[in-house]
Swiss-Prot record:
Species per Swiss-Prot/TrEMBL record: Rattus norvegicus
UniProt lineage: Eukaryota, Metazoa, Chordata, Craniata, Vertebrata
Gene3D superfamilies: Glutamine Phosphoribosylpyrophosphate, subunit 1, domain 1
Tissue specificity statement from the Swiss-Prot or TrEMBL entry: Ubiquitous.
A GO term from the CC aspect: nucleus
Name of the protein in its database record: Proteasome subunit beta type-1
Length: 240
């Protein structure tokens, strides 16, 4: 028979008195939930890719198998969000509203770099009650080159060539470091990354992640940003 003595429910905590005696059981509400999922972005010379799985889960329950974590912001910019799904939806709605206001005021779309700076201020304004979201913005910059911006929950951000975030990021980031960044490798020719090779790499790493991470799976949604616009591609992943 399995023992439940070591199990601890974070929302139902036993409070001890001053002499170590057991006090009343208190119910504590947590405003956050972790809904899993993984996002990944790669920037090339004239393209950028952001990809995510479509599984939305909590603990050992799957809420839906069709919940992509990539959101189109402009014709040249896409954001990938993972973490607490409620915060993902709220944050993307705020960004979309700000982009509409900017377009009406300036008669042009906001650039990818400006969107990244705007998101940084939005996240910093909520630093005392932050959004439980890992954000990656990818798109094309003013020169038409691929750009990837990664953020922490309170607004610090930097531009990268590739980045992974979410539940399987610990597995994906070393693969990107090796295959895209050629880090810690000797006597290796640094070949420029092509769109075809980047697509194959994204599919391979997500298939591998779905084998090991219970929060990643069902399907892979890929958004490819080029000067022609944004196109999407869907690849099935394992569903167990």
């Amino acid at each position: 028979m399995l023992s439940t003595a070591a199990y601890r429910d974070p929302d139902r905590e036993l409070v001890m008195g001053p002499q170590g005696s057991a006090g009343p059981v208190q119910m504590r509400f947590s405003p956050y939930a972790f809904n899993g999922g993984t996002v990944l972005a790669i920037a090339g010379e004239d393209f950028s890719i952001v990809a995510s799985d479509t599984r939305l889960s909590e603990g050992f329950s799957i809420h839906t198998r069709d919940s992509p974590k990539c959101y189109k912001l402009t014709d040249k910019t896409v954001i990938g969000c993972s973490g607490f799904h409620g915060d993902c939806l709220t944050l993307t709605k705020i960004i979309e509203a700000r982009l509409k206001m900017y377009k009406h005021s300036n008669n042009k779309a906001m650039t990818t770099g400006a969107i990244a700076a705007m998101l940084s201020t939005i996240l910093y304004s909520r630093r005392f009650f932050p959004y439980y979201v890992y954000n990656i913005i990818e798109g094309l910059d003013e020169e038409g080159k691929g750009a990837v911006y990664s953020f922490d929950p309170v607004g610090s951000y930097q531009r990268d060539s590739f980045k992974a975030g979410g539940s399987a990021s610990a597995m994906l980031q070393p693969l990107l470091d090796n295959q895209v960044g050629f880090k810690n490798m000797q006597n290796v020719e640094h070949v420029p990354l092509t769109l075809d090779r980047a697509m194959r790499l994204v599919k391979d790493v997500f298939i591998s992640a779905a084998e090991r991470d219970v929060y990643t799976g069902d399907a892979l949604r890929i958004c490819i940003v080029t000067k022609e616009g944004i196109r999407e591609e869907t690849v099935p992943l394992r569903k167990d």
